[in-house]
Amino acid sequence: MNTEGASLSEQLLDAARRNNLDLLETVFDSLDNDPEKIAKLINESKEPLGNTALHLCCKYGSWEVLDKILDQDGEIEIDPQNDVDGDTPLHVTVRYSQEEPEHGTFIARNLIEVGADPRVRNYNNQKPVDLVHGDELDELIDLLQGAELAIDSTNGSGDNNEDGEMIDDGPSDDDEEDDKK
């Protein structure tokens, strides 16, 4: 992309698409490396489908640019939903993982470490873990499920199943006592 005449928003999105760290740093320099201005640009810049720079980094596996964005001091929105299907960057990462399992799992782990919420559902009522298909993605499934459990236990809602489903984890202690009688 020829950046001459391109807005900072367009340059940011292009840097995310192409994993172009030099372009990203040029954009940040144009904003005097001001964390508030950078965060505002990152949070408000969207392509026509509503994908942010975070979505694009996750879609194309642009780790260097994503890492630099996640390291910013400003208030970066980590779970924005795109306009088309309501996917968060974590949803997009799971889709990317179908083609690049190791790299996608690495990106997902880093998103979760900075606060991405694996419980967010898209417009099809799917959490990121619901998008996983394939035998080689067991590590990703474990990561997403573990992150959900960690959030639920931290919030004190580990006993509350969001969907209202009963989870059968085998015989209860009461059943075992009945069997002994």
Curated annotation (Swiss-Prot):
Annotated Gene Ontology cellular component terms: cytoplasm
Region annotation Disordered: where it falls in the sequence: 151-181
Domain of life assignment: Eukaryota
Chain intervals with Acidic residues compositional bias: 160-181
Residues recorded with modification Phosphoserine: S172
Residues that bear N-acetylmethionine: M1
Keyword line: Acetylation, ANK repeat, Phosphoprotein, Repeat
Per-repeat ranges for ANK: 49-78, 85-120
Pfam families: Ank_2 (PF12796)
The keyword Phosphoprotein is assigned to this record: yes
Protein name: Ankyrin repeat-containing protein YGL242C
Organism listed in the record: Saccharomyces cerevisiae (strain ATCC 204508 / S288c)
